[in-house]
Structure formats: structure tokens, C-alpha cells
Regions:
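Extended hydrophobic/Leu-rich segments
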Residues: 1, 83-84, 312, 316-317
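Long, low-complexity ectodomains and other extracytoplasmic segments of secretory-pathway proteins
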Residues: 1-44, 65, 170-213
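Surface-exposed binding patches on compact interaction domains or structured appendages
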Residues: 2-41, 64-146
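Short, solvent-exposed loop/linker segments at the N-terminal edge
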Residues: 47-53
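Extended acidic/polar, glycine-enriched regions
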Residues: 48, 60-78, 131-191, 219
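A short, hydrophobic secondary-structure junction motif
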Residues: 53-55, 131, 280, 332
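A common structural microfeature
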Residues: 54-58, 67-69, 236, 291, ...
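Aromatic-lined carbohydrate-binding surfaces of glycoside hydrolases
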Residues: 120, 149, 160-167, 173-352
């Protein structure tokens, strides 16, 4: 990606005293890709944490020469005979993506942009990459994100360890880690009082991993992603009960998880197979079971899908609240949906 924003020239990069440098930075800054980071060099990161708490840090590497097969390792953190294992620590290269302005008018809103040329684009550090070994180009900056999940069973004390970056053509570079674990315990995420609801899009997972919707491969791909969400304290399951509830403005639009069938005699039937499969997966395998959020009876576009047996095709009903057709479409569905939810034991935790 080429950044259109001003950045350091080759001459500035070439003045670096050491070809490759590594330091702790701050989690408050997205470091530009093509400029030398503005950091006060430090090889020691110190923080305090409760038992059961997760703490984050960001290191930043910058280099005027290309690095081959760069990778990150962390040691166990030790306090006397007590250990926070390296398995409780995750590290990721931070990947850069192209984005555009959101807050040009300082109103902080989103929406349609009639003239997209008026909104500037830039390269920003955003994605915590799943790639563990990568080449780093000359005259670039590479942030590194570290997360430590202190075990609830950890003993209080000061734990020390190291983060190391290595590469084929570079000597190992080390940073020191020091976590002061206090004698207080944070409850497990499932026991938090805070209500977190980050919408899930299973359709995007299927597209990204190129697997059939609702197949075993699809659920296998979603499992680690949704478990991360559960570990963040997620409370609600996102379900789409109609086609494109948000008019399809996301990269991967939401289909309806419930099939509506208008029979030849004009009566309605409903297939909840996908809805049930998704909800049961999230509840039973992931552990998110406080609430089922259903979207929506009032979509951006007042157009409602159903399969029509008379024409053997999917049709769309254009209607609005107050119309008889709207009352028939939704009233009949809500009665049957309520029956189904009660049979599953989900009625009291479902909201539209």
C-alpha cells in the first residue's frame, strides 16, 4: 500500500544510526507506516494488573533495510517460582490497511457520501495480523501488539520476561516485560456485569475463508473468532430475520436466517433451521447466551423477502407500518416465531 499522506523521505531514513531499531511505544498511537516513529526509546515496559485481567502493550520496530522472515517470541514471565506461561501471552504484527476519512465534518457520523472524492484516503495501522512470520520492507515501521491475560490463579508479585524479534538477516532484538500482579481478582468475562454487544457477521467469515454457509467448515472457521468475542464479555447473539436489514451497506450483506414461505393457498410457513443452528452454536459451543438480538422489523429499505410457492421464486413485499400487508406479513410471523422461541426456551431472552 502506498500512503498519499506526507511521510519521511529516503534521506531521513538513511540517516538512522542503527539500521533496525526496536522500542516499546504506546497503545494510544497508530504509528505511520512510512515515517520513523516519534517514540522515546525504551526497552522496558512496566505495568500493573489484577489476577484475571488482560493488559496490552505496543512495541514498534523501524528499519532502513529489508528484514526477511521476521517473527516474534515471548518468554514465560517469572516471579520467583511463580510463572505466567507464554501461552497466556499473544503477539501480533499490526497490519496496515487503506481507509478514508470518517470525521471530515467533525460530526463523527457515518452515512452516504455522494462525492467520494471529497473524502481523503490514507494508510493506517489497524489489523492484528494472524500471520506470524513476515518480511518487513526497507524504510518502514512495523508495530507489534502484545496481550497478556494474567491467570486468575497467579500469585501476586512482579513477573519479568522478554519479547524477542528475530529475522533471517538481523540479530535478535529484545525488550523487557515487567508485570506487577496485584492481590485482586477480576471475575471471568461471563460473570461481568457490563453488557457488551458487538454485532457478529457470520456471512463475512464464510466469504473470507471460502467455505459454504452453515457448513461444518463454516462453523470451524467461526469458532476461534467467536470465542475471542466471548472472552471479551459479549452478551448478545446477532441474528438477521430478514434479507439485508441494513440495506446491505456492509461488505458482506446479511441474509435472512429464517425462510418465510407463502404457500399456494396464501397461508404462511417458516423454516427456522439456520436460525436455530446459529443460535445453538453461539450458546452451546461459544457460551454467549444472555440475549438473542433479531434485526429487524423496520429496515432501512421497507422491502421484505419471502419464498412464493405460486411462482417458485423469492419475492419482495414493499410495504410499511400501518399497511394491511405489513400487519399480515409481520403479525403472522411474530405469532409463529413466539411459539418457536417458547419451544426452544429462548422467548424471554429474545428482542427485536
Amino acid at each position: 500500500l502506498t500512503d498519499t499522506k506526507p511521510h519521511d523521505s529516503d534521506e531521513i531514513w538513511d540517516k538512522l544510526s542503527a539500521p533496525t531499531q526496536l522500542s516499546w511505544g504506546t497503545t494510544d498511537i497508530r504509528y505511520p507506516k512510512l515515517s520513523i516513529p516519534d517514540v522515546k526509546k525504551s526497552n522496558r515496559w512496566q505495568t500493573k494488573a489484577w489476577k484475571g485481567e488482560r493488559v496490552n502493550a505496543q512495541a514498534v520496530l523501524w528499519t532502513k533495510v529489508g528484514l526477511e522472515d521476521a517473527s516474534i517470541t515471548v518468554s514465560d514471565l517469572k516471579s520467583g517460582s511463580s510463572i505466567i506461561p507464554s501461552s497466556a501471552i499473544t503477539t501480533n504484527f499490526v497490519r496496515y490497511v487503506m481507509t478514508d476519512e470518517l470525521n471530515k465534518d467533525r460530526k463523527g457520523g457515518c452515512g452516504h457520501r455522494e462525492n467520494k472524492a471529497e473524502w481523503d484516503s490514507s494508510v493506517v495501522a489497524d489489523v492484528l495480523d494472524i500471520v506470524k512470520i513476515r518480511d518487513i520492507k526497507a524504510r518502514t515501521t512495523q508495530p507489534i501488539w502484545m496481550n497478556i491475560w494474567v491467570p486468575q490463579s497467579a500469585k501476586a508479585g512482579k513477573y519479568k520476561g522478554t519479547l524477542t524479534v528475530t529475522g533471517k538477516n538481523a540479530s535478535p532484538m529484545e525488550l523487557q516485560i515487567e508485570v506487577d500482579v496485584l492481590n485482586r481478582t477480576l471475575p471471568a468475562p461471563k460473570d461481568w456485569a457490563f453488557h457488551l454487544d458487538l454485532w457478529q457477521n457470520p456471512y463475512s467469515v464464510a466469504r473470507y475463508y471460502q467455505v459454504p454457509l452453515w457448513s461444518k467448515e463454516h462453523f470451524d472457521a467461526m469458532r476461534p473468532i467467536m470465542k475471542m468475542l466471548a472472552n471479551a464479555g459479549q452478551r448478545a447473539i446477532t441474528t438477521s430475520i430478514m434479507h439485508k436489514p441494513w440495506a446491505g451497506q456492509t461488505e458482506d450483506h446479511f441474509d435472512s436466517m429464517i425462510t418465510r414461505i407463502k404457500k399456494i393457498d396464501g397461508t404462511w410457513a417458516y423454516d427456522y433451521a439456520v436460525f436455530d443452528k446459529w443460535v445453538e452454536f453461539m450458546m452451546n459451543e461459544i457460551g454467549i447466551d444472555d440475549m438473542i438480538s433479531c434485526y429487524t422489523m423496520i429496515p432501512w429499505a421497507l422491502s421484505f423477502d419471502y419464498y412464493d410457492e405460486a411462482t417458485n421464486r423469492v419475492q419482495f413485499l414493499n410495504t410499511k407500518p400501518g399497511d394491511a400487508a405489513y400487519a399480515d406479513y409481520w403479525g403472522t410471523f411474530l405469532k409463529d416465531f413466539s411459539r418457536h422461541l417458547r419451544e426452544k426456551g429462548w422467548f424471554e431472552k429474545t428482542a427485536i
